[in-house]
Amino acid sequence: MKAVIFVVDGLGDRPDKNGNTPLKEAKTPVMDRMAKEGICGLMNSVDIGVRPGSDTAHLALLGYDPYTTYTGRGPFEACGVGVTVKPGDIAFRCNFSSVDENFIVTDRRAGRIENTSELEKELDGLKIDDVEIIFKESGGYRAALVLRGPGLSDKITDADPKKEGKKVKEIHPLDDSKEAKKTAEIVNKLLKIAYEKLDKHPVNEERRKQNLPVANMIVPRGVGQVPEIMQFTEKTGLKGACIAGTGLIKGIAKMVGLDVIDVEGCDGTPDSDFMAKACAIVETLENYDFILVNVKGADEAGHDGNYELKKQVIEKVDEMLDYITKNISKDEVYFVLSGDHSTPIEEMDHSADPLPVVLWGKSVRVDDVEKFDEFSTYKGGLNWIKGVHIMPILLDLMGLAKKYGA
Amino acid sequence: MKAVIFVVDGLGDRPDKNGNTPLKEAKTPVMDRMAKEGICGLMNSVDIGVRPGSDTAHLALLGYDPYTTYTGRGPFEACGVGVTVKPGDIAFRCNFSSVDENFIVTDRRAGRIENTSELEKELDGLKIDDVEIIFKESGGYRAALVLRGPGLSDKITDADPKKEGKKVKEIHPLDDSKEAKKTAEIVNKLLKIAYEKLDKHPVNEERRKQNLPVANMIVPRGVGQVPEIMQFTEKTGLKGACIAGTGLIKGIAKMVGLDVIDVEGCDGTPDSDFMAKACAIVETLENYDFILVNVKGADEAGHDGNYELKKQVIEKVDEMLDYITKNISKDEVYFVLSGDHSTPIEEMDHSADPLPVVLWGKSVRVDDVEKFDEFSTYKGGLNWIKGVHIMPILLDLMGLAKKYGA
């Protein structure tokens, strides 16, 4: 048996004045068929009333308790852009920013500079005291920063003043440990070095000539210590892959040892990359036991408050599911369809409203639910579960769960 | 958006031989309409199978884990009667009792003595070693006792022999700590001092003349160390009030920083203080973001095993809800209607039977439930939740929940 967890990012919603949601109104014959043939319920990826980020939500869906494994966004972002992080590393997300000689930020994104690979070289591989600096640009003004060395801590403040016209913040330790003090000192030294190396760099001299904002500073935030995470295969016995568009989800996948499959296009149908992803899922299942799929789009529509677009994205996902369910065998694959969090149109942000979930496959206890939406699935046999319950339920159905006791 | 948590104390019940409960039989058109317009479920204020006190239940409903914040009844009672307690204080409830010269209790409530303010003065403000004694009578034979000083502990036994004819118990430490030993010694010294000061007090000499039991001893029980509790406003961002009749609930409210609103009467309708409370709720909502309401009566009827009275109280509460829902806007106020625990007629005490709960307001996922009772709401979209889930769900609906992750 194999398994797929299919995450429609931002899927859930709150009813509008007419009691409708994009998912309720969307034409989703395949989702509804899966609801009819499967076992349904509600799910909060983290917990009831907890408004999750995509990162904490996906960790939970993969069976990891986010409260012990999620140390901050930095480690997962760094992992996502290809840094091979190690437990104990201190990782940050960074912006290249423009600052004046007093470190006052004049442009947080350095004029959305597009190519920072030459600037990256100035910082990557530096050594400050006994700490190695790993620095990788991740497309334009964004970058990941990793500190590797003995006696470091993530109990430090970040540098981001959040607003232009404010000074890049000095890093301070958040506790009395010598590790926090040392880490804060290293980052403060690094920021000075970064300014010295970047301000007069030819890339920036050229930008000055063109009246473009210079990328003469890095501003780290989202600090976290890379956690010790038991790898997915060791934990589950499954060879796992991840198909996702966003770097953060890829980072989570890499952190737990899933192979990230990049999808470029595929001859299933001509219709956008949704179908390319559907093809990739079917193909990847030939070589893997497990796939975590994330489909963005509904979340973005939610963040934009665009009801119609969210509905359309959900309908496209339904087409993906049509292709997938026609090309996999219910006797061989367990399929979990849900989201990572709701992104209600009225909130334009993540919410804690629970998600509909369906578990489809051989030998599940089919319930009476006949429609996949926020108003039907709560009556199903899965009741109201948490994200961390999904993997144990799947492993049990697959005959892979360890017995607890005798 | 604002929010009300409306607690009908002791609301739930077990079915009688005909399968009825006071709530099921009561005519409650407003509760039923709220169930129809809202999202329903079952709730255990503390946890499934846990038989809660009103104190632990209300802490949970306010979003505080009772297992970490509830240290005993003493601190909340003391707070409720107006002692400004501080984290670390050791607090007790006390009775004034009558004892003989060997400390054998002859009347646990000192003949239900009505005025103890003169006796209070003998004890309040004493200093024993480095510990300050704060003592406040709280109406008749009841009082609150607080010890304030360095190195104290609540790991001690209490003094209450529970029966007349038994000796006031010596206090013993419950662990090997020097704090517990010190605290036990202080209380033992205090009891001796209390007897010395009270036994010959003019108030008691006068009672002896009138053949009334003397209030010549205090008997502390319900010890607890005042916990560090994050204040409600800091935790939630909401300016909160509490409308409740009983001192214990007021104490909980004060402990978490809610303003306690005392209701004396109100010109809404002439019909008892139920309607006065209903008016006060509507008025208080003008100046506050959040109100915790507790309506006693159903609980008392349950403790008395009085089915008809419990039903009548519930019908009066329905009239309150009629007034309230007509005078607030569903677009501005989230309203949670439930109880703190069941008080079944057959038990005449609190039980762990879960409570019906409805969450009424804008943008909730309305379910199919059409009646508010123990037999209908479990089919609703809220499923079976715990008391500590209520505040996170409300804060999420109000757009005030913090995101966990990115």
UniProtKB/Swiss-Prot annotation, chains A, B:
It holds the Pfam family PhosphMutase. Catalyzes the interconversion of 2-phosphoglycerate and 3-phosphoglycerate. One of its GO terms (biological process) is glycolytic process. Belongs to the BPG-independent phosphoglycerate mutase family. A-PGAM subfamily. It catalyses: (2R)-2-phosphoglycerate = (2R)-3-phosphoglycerate. The keyword Isomerase applies. HAMAP family: ApgM_A (MF_01402_A). Disulfide bonds: none annotated. It comes from Methanococcus maripaludis (strain DSM 14266 / JCM 13030 / NBRC 101832 / S2 / LL). Keywords: Glycolysis, Isomerase. GO terms for molecular function: metal ion binding; phosphoglycerate mutase activity. Pathway: Carbohydrate degradation; glycolysis; pyruvate from D-glyceraldehyde 3-phosphate: step 3/5. This is 2,3-bisphosphoglycerate-independent phosphoglycerate mutase. Its EC number is 5.4.2.12. The keyword Metal-binding does not apply. InterPro entries: Alkaline_phosphatase_core_sf (IPR017850), ApgAM_prokaryotes (IPR023665), Metalloenzyme (IPR006124), Pglycerate_mutase_ApgM (IPR004456). The gene is apgM.
